[in-house]
From Swiss-Prot:
Transmembrane segments: none annotated. It comes from the Viruses. ANK repeats lie at residues 111-143, 152-182, 183-213, 215-238, 239-266, 267-298. It comes from Acanthamoeba polyphaga mimivirus (APMV). This is Putative ankyrin repeat protein R599. InterPro entries: Ankyrin_rpt, Ankyrin_rpt-contain_sf. Keywords: ANK repeat, Repeat.
């Protein structure tokens, strides 16, 4: 059934297109830039940055039951005080944090962003709760807390892994009143792209009601997640053509079918993507496309247009070579099979899985 329909595609123009794209596919669909702009470097790199002797004396005195740390603190600059506070937060030691705050003039209302951001990004739950109890609002720094908790914070953690995970931190933030739909529903978007079902359930159970790709494309597809969102009546404000293409890239046949049923246009697939599917010999994906109504005439037209729109010296050489082979009577269908097999053997094409 599949190959009977495949024969309807003009093999000559498909061979031209396949040959021309073979060397481009290795560099296509690189990982999209998923750097999170609101994650501040100074909240991750948290060394005390003091001379070794002073640092050693300070940590020793902080761990004792004496006040020997006070003269050391008093001899340091305000910048040093901030660095020391950040360090105590990174190691999540509330006792040290309180001692430093009590003997300095640091104003939490002025430095709340750097201190709380450090607590969030390092999953320092005890220090986070302490600072919140001191009156710092949960929506500090443009709702940083809940936005950061919905990405995979563990990859940023500076010190040894703590007992608390970013999901635990998210629960704390939500319990303290964090806005689950802030920034155009960014928390749920981040949790979906992180493929974190626990965070998704936590957000939905606490009022997250829309998945939006308004700011960035959704790169993760997971049938269980999307079925959960649908079952819980979460509005999907997404470009189904884009996410359908992403499911193809992710080799996710089940999500492909779901997105087609939700309204994705199966004929929106670009010719380059179809070429890559064929070059990669991804039989199951191709079979779904055809069985769900891929317009073969439209594909032939697209490939013809692609060839005409990208005419250049190299492309002309490709066309001349393929036409010469065809005119000589060489079996184009079998030759295309060889091209695909050689491409698989030589280049080992793969579709990279996206991660955050």
């Amino acid at each position: 059934m599949l190959f009977k329909k495949i024969d309807d595609i003009n093999p000559l123009i498909l061979l031209i297109d396949s040959c021309q794209y073979t060397n481009q596919i290795m560099n296509s669909y690189r990982h999209r830039n998923q750097t999170t702009s609101f994650i501040r470097k100074e909240t991750i790199d948290c060394n005390i940055q003091l001379p070794r002797k002073i640092e050693s004396d300070l940590l020793l005195s902080l761990s004792s039951n004496t006040d020997d740390y006070i003269p050391i603190i008093n001899s340091l600059s305000n910048e040093d005080h901030i660095n020391i506070l950040k360090y105590t937060i990174v190691i999540d030691n509330v006792n040290y944090l309180e001692k430093i705050l009590n003997c300095t003039s640091i104003d939490l209302s002025v430095n709340d962003d750097i201190l709380l951001c450090t607590a969030i990004i390092n999953c320092s739950s005890e220090c986070l709760l302490y600072l919140l109890d001191k009156g710092i609002p949960i929506d500090f720094c443009d709702n940083y807390a809940i936005r950061a908790c919905c990405i995979r914070l563990e990859k940023y953690i500076y010190t040894t892994r703590k007992n608390k995970s970013s999901c635990d931190m998210l629960k704390i933030v939500i319990d303290r009143g964090g806005n689950v739909n802030t920034h155009n529903y960014e928390p749920l978007y981040s949790a979906v792209n992180d493929n974190n079902f626990d965070k998704i359930k936590l957000l939905v159970e606490n009022g997250a009601n829309k998945l939006s790709d308004f700011k960035r494309k959704i790169t993760n597809t997971n049938l269980e997640i999307f079925q959960y969102l649908i079952d819980n009546r979460v509005e999907l404000e997404v470009n189904f053509d884009d996410i359908f293409l992403q499911s193809i890239i992710n080799d996710d046949s089940e999500c492909m079918k779901l997105f087609i049923e939700l309204g994705a246009n199966i004929n929106s697939i670009p010719t380059l993507e179809l070429t890559k599917i064929i070059i990669n010999a991804r039989h199951e994906i191709l079979e779904i496309l055809i069985n769900y109504g891929l317009d073969i005439n439209n594909i032939n037209d697209k490939i013809n247009n692609e060839i005409n729109d990208n005419r250049c010296e190299d492309y002309d050489e490709t066309i001349k070579t393929v036409e010469l082979v065809s005119n000589a009577g060489i079996d184009i269908i079998n030759l295309l099979k060889v091209v695909i097999q050689n491409a698989l053997s030589v280049y080992n094409f793969t579709y990279p899985k996206y991660s955050i």
